[in-house]
Regions:
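A short, surface-exposed beta-strand/turn
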Residues: 108-119
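Short, low-complexity N-terminal intrinsically disordered segments enriched in polar/charged residues
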Residues: 5-12, 16-39
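Extracytoplasmic/periplasmic, Sec-exported soluble proteins
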Residues: 25-29, 38-41, 59, 104, ...
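N-terminal secretory signal peptides that target proteins for export/translocation
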Residues: 1-2
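Solvent-exposed strand-loop boundary residues in beta-sheet-rich modules
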Residues: 56, 101-103, 116-118
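Short, well-ordered alpha-helical segments enriched in acidic and aromatic residues
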Residues: 33, 41-58
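Surface-exposed, charged secondary-structure patches
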Residues: 64-109, 124
Length: 124
């Protein structure tokens, strides 16, 4: 009986560690989404890019991929300098993203939406 209690206690501790290890804030997961998107963009991995985009206007994956390829050819690699002013309200979020490409920097507000448990950049 004591081995069973010990085993259950160890399972409970292990489960608590797993849950405790997933302590990213909503703001951090928004930032990770944006940084992962640009990592895929720089690698020209369009499938991963498309996985980070919400196409609520139903533009279509082929059209978005075509636009991404043209943009990548024009910008070259993009460096994400910062992700700031992350504001999460329910299943929507915005973040100010400062990027540098071709020696130029710009900061834009990115709208995001949470779908199926993951943040997606809203395609506009």
């Amino acid at each position: 009986m004591s081995r069973r209690i010990l085993a259950l206690a160890l399972i409970a501790v292990f489960a608590a560690l797993l849950v405790g290890g997933c302590s990213d804030t909503k703001e951090e997961t928004v930032e990770y989404t944006i940084r992962d998107y640009y990592s895929a963009y720089n690698a020209e991995d369009w499938d991963i890019c498309l996985g980070h985009i919400d196409d609520t206007d139903n533009v279509g994956a082929a059209t978005i991929e075509s636009v991404l390829k043209m943009a990548r050819a024009a910008t070259g690699e993009v460096i994400v300098e910062s992700v700031t002013n992350v504001n999460v309200t329910g299943s929507t979020a915005t973040a100010d993203v400062k990027i540098t490409f071709g020696g130029q920097s710009e900061t834009k507000e990115y709208p995001l939406v949470k779908k199926d448990g993951s943040w997606k950049i809203s395609w506009q």
